[in-house]
């Protein structure tokens, strides 16, 4: 193999390791069995959430993970692997959530594992992460909780006002 090819591969691994280091959330899946249209739709959905998906040879994945300090992630790099990741701090659950949705829709998609903020996560932990709503969902839940006491107070005031109107008649 020529030195130029070896240098190009080493550069790719180094660049991918930097992407993995900066990633806030990483999910590794087995995607084999999806059609081209399904993979294209999957990538489009990931792009909308500021996430990326790369299909990389397992040897490169192991080397990049080692350089990124994710050595414990190496055991999941067996068989066909795609790495989904995001560096968006506001939406760290997106890769896990989208991968879990596709795993439910298509039996061929399998979540293998992942990492969150540099900590390796098991398949089960990634699935738990997928159950957490995104930032917008959490904010709407918080808003609902904050509005409840005010709304209940308004109902009580309205009921008191109505009862006084009825007693005045």
Swiss-Prot record:
It comes from Lactobacillus delbrueckii subsp. bulgaricus (strain ATCC 11842 / DSM 20081 / BCRC 10696 / JCM 1002 / NBRC 13953 / NCIMB 11778 / NCTC 12712 / WDCM 00102 / Lb 14). Part of the ribosomal stalk of the 50S ribosomal subunit. The N-terminus interacts with L11 and the large rRNA to form the base of the stalk. The C-terminus forms an elongated spine to which L12 dimers bind in a sequential fashion forming a multimeric L10(L12)X complex. Coiled coil: none annotated. GO terms for biological process: translation. This is Large ribosomal subunit protein uL10. Forms part of the ribosomal stalk, playing a central role in the interaction of the ribosome with GTP-bound translation factors. SUPFAM superfamilies: Ribosomal protein L10-like. GO terms for cellular component: large ribosomal subunit. The lineage of its organism: Bacteria, Bacillati, Bacillota, Bacilli, Lactobacillales. Keywords: Ribonucleoprotein, Ribosomal protein, RNA-binding, rRNA-binding. Belongs to the universal ribosomal protein uL10 family. The gene is rplJ. It comes from the Bacteria. CDD domains: Ribosomal_L10 (cd05797). PANTHER family: 39S RIBOSOMAL PROTEIN L10, MITOCHONDRIAL. One of its GO terms (molecular function) is structural constituent of ribosome. The keyword Protein transport does not apply.
């Amino acid at each position: 193999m020529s030195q130029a090819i070896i240098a190009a591969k080493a550069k790719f691994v180094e660049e991918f390791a930097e992407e993995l280091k900066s990633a806030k959330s990483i999910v590794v899946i087995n995607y084999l069995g999806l059609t081209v249209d399904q993979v294209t739709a999957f990538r489009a959905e990931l792009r909308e959430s500021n996430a990326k998906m790369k299909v990389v040879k397992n040897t490169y994945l192991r080397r990049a993970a080692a350089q990124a300090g994710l050595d414990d992630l190496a055991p999941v790099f067996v068989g066909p692997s795609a790495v989904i990741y995001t560096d968006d701090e506001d939406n760290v659950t997106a890769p896990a959530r989208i991968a879990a949705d596709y795993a439910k829709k298509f039996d061929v998609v399998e979540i293998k594992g992942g990492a969150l903020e540099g900590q390796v996560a098991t398949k089960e932990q990634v699935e738990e992460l997928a159950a957490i709503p995104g930032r917008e969902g959490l904010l709407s839940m918080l808003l609902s909780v904050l509005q409840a006491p005010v709304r209940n107070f308004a109902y009580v005031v309205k009921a008191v006002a109505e009862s006084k109107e009825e007693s005045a008649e």
